[in-house]
Each structure stands twice: as C-alpha cells, then as structure tokens.
C-alpha cells in the first residue's frame, strides 16, 4: 500500500464520518452551519484560499464595475451560504429524496414541455451550469423514469469517486468521465439516450467566444457539434433552492425548470455552432440573473481573453 493510497483511505474515512453527521442535520441546522461557514470564508479565511478576488472580479464583470465593495461582499457571502448548503444537500440527497416524497420538496415548472421533448424519440441534451442544485436536478429525472448519461470529472481520490458515482447512478443514470468517456456517450446517444452536461466552463484558446453577462466567454464547441451531429434537442434547465418556509420543513424546497428548448434541426445561421452556443449561454444567464447568489462565482468563467485566441490564429497562420 502506497503513501498516496493511505492518504486516500484516510480522506475517505473522514468524509464518511462527516457525512454521517451531515445526514442528520435539519434544515434549520444546515442554514446555521452555512451562514457560519460563509462568514468564515468571507471574513476569516485567506483570500487566496476563498478565491475572494476571483469572485469579486466575476461579480463586477457580470453586474457592473460600479458595485460597492459592500455589495460585492454581500454577493460573495450569500454565494458561500448557498455552496455550503449545496454540499450538505448533495450528501443528504440519496436519503432525503425519493419518488414518494418528491412532491414535498420539488416544484417542476414547464414539466409538460420537457416530458414532450423526452418522448420525442430524439436524443436530448440537458444543459446547465454551476448554478443552483445541479445534482438534484439530474437525480429528479432519474426518479421520474428518464435516466441519462451524466458527464462529470473523475475525482482524484478513487474511494470518494466511487461513493459519488454510486450516489449519482442510484436513480438509473450512467456516469461518464470528461476524459475518455466519449465512446460510451456516443453509443448512448446513437441509441436514443439522453445526456446531462454543464456548459459554463472556460474552454481555453480553442473555444468559441460568446457573450455571457455582456462579456466574451470561451465556451466548448463540442456541445453544439455533438448536438448537430446527432440532431439532438437541447433543454437548458435549472434547479434553484426556494426560500425556506418554514425552517422546520422536512427538507429544503426547490424549483426545477426549463429556461429554453433549442431544436438544433431548426437552426438557420451562418455559423450554427456559435448560434447554438450563444443561445444556450444566454438562456443560462437569464436563469442565473433570477438567483445570482446560487451561482458558482469562484470559478474562472472569463479566464481566456479573446486576444489570446487571435494570437493563436495568427501564429497558426504564420506556421502554415
């Protein structure tokens, strides 16, 4: 047994011990824990650790540079409250939510339109972002009898990765790694299956730049390219936590909804890939604007500058 394996095992044991405590938390206790944790991350933790400056830059990029420091700090505090609650709810999800009690916790907006698309016989790509409760959104469709392939990054710790894999697959889904899972996804979609993907990660210099909160954001082309190849229907959705009323409720309450349905066979544009990418990015932005505190502002969404992409093009042109 290597030192690394020992570390992974210790991490897993500590996680399972913490999970046992977390699973027993009530809504009121979760809110108190989240607010305390958010205060620590905002006011005590080193800003390099809390990625405070990244979140601050992103929030100002999205909502205007004229926001005061106090307003930005309030946004960041509320974001951390959400993220800590998200971690707790993700761990509690397998025990707290099932088909018998889901009506108590979930409101499904535009359900009829989504079910109609799912029954169309065509592949459906469910697109979302690091927003709201993305784990719950996907799990709900599995409970309703619509399993899909879920694309996610594999965790470094194999024991933790296996725990999360089982948690995600217990409602009938199939987990595919972002690296090396294409063959499985291809087989699933060609058989008429559905995929769930997060679409708000920076794609580097080779991505397609589209407007996201009024600023160019590098976005992966592969989503639009796959959708065009398979003639897939895109459903841009979300799952947001609703206000706690009352705090004594059995569990938190959520709204799952469809922001936009995009039929890729109906796209008429000079650059179909960019048009599709812009449309689903704009739809995601609209949903985030309604609950900005539930977005993951600490990730580098605008990491790649469009000027970097142009430099790459110039270099490739000279090399040719």
Task: Please tell me what each predicted stretch does.
Residues 2-7, 65, 69-77, 116-120, ...:
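Non-catalytic C-terminal accessory region of glycerolipid acyltransferases
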Residues 13, 51, 106, 177, ...:
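Soluble or luminal CAZymes and related metallo-dependent hydrolases
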Residues 100-106, 153, 170-176, 213-214, ...:
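Short, flexible loop segments at the rims of nucleotide/cofactor-binding pockets, characterized by
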Residues 52-54, 153-158, 217-220:
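Active-site metal-coordination segments of metallo-dependent hydrolases
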Residues 118-179, 205-208, 212:
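Catalytic core of membrane glycerolipid acyltransferases/transacylases, capturing the structured
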Residues 17, 54, 112, 136, ...:
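Short Gly/charged-rich anion-binding patches and loops
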Residues 1-128, 162, 166, 172, ...:
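Membrane-anchoring hydrophobic helices of lipid-metabolizing enzymes
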Residues 58, 135, 168, 200, ...:
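Acidic active-site catalytic centers that drive phospho-/nucleotidyl reactions
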């Amino acid at each position: 047994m290597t030192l690394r394996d020992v570390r992974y095992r210790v991490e897993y044991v500590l996680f399972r011990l913490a999970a046992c405590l977390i699973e027993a938390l009530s809504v009121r206790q979760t809110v108190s824990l989240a607010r305390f944790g958010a205060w620590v991350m905002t006011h005590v933790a080193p800003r390099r650790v809390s990625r405070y400056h990244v979140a601050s830059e992103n929030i100002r990029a999205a909502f205007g540079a004229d926001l005061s420091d106090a307003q930005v700090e309030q946004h960041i505090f509320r974001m951390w409250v959400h993220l800590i609650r998200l971690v707790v709810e993700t761990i509690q999800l397998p025990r707290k939510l099932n088909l018998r009690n889901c009506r108590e916790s979930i409101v499904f907006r535009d359900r009829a339109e989504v079910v109609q698309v799912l029954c169309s016989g065509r592949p459906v790509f469910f697109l979302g972002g690091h927003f709201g409760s993305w784990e719950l959104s996907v799990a709900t469709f599995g409970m309703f009898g619509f399993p899909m392939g879920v694309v996610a990054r594999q965790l470094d710790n194999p024991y933790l990765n296996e725990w999360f894999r089982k948690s995600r697959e217990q409602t009938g889904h199939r987990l595919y790694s972002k690296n090396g899972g294409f063959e499985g996804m291809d087989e699933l979609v060609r058989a008429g299956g559905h995929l769930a993907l997060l679409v708000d990660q920076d794609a580097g210099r080779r991505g397609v730049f589209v407007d996201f909160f009024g600023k160019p954001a590098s976005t992966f082309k592969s989503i639009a390219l796959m959708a065009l190849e398979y003639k897939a229907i895109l459903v841009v959705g979300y799952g947001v936590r609703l206000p706690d009323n009352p705090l004594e409720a059995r569990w938190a309450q959520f709204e799952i909804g469809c922001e936009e349905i995009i039929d890729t066979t109906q796209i008429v544009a000079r650059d179909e890939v960019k048009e599709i990418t812009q449309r689903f990015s704009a739809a995601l932005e609209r949903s985030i604007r309604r609950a900005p505190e539930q977005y993951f502002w600490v990730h580098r969404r605008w990491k790649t500058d469009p000027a970097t992409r142009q430099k790459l093009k110039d270099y490739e042109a000279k090399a040719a």
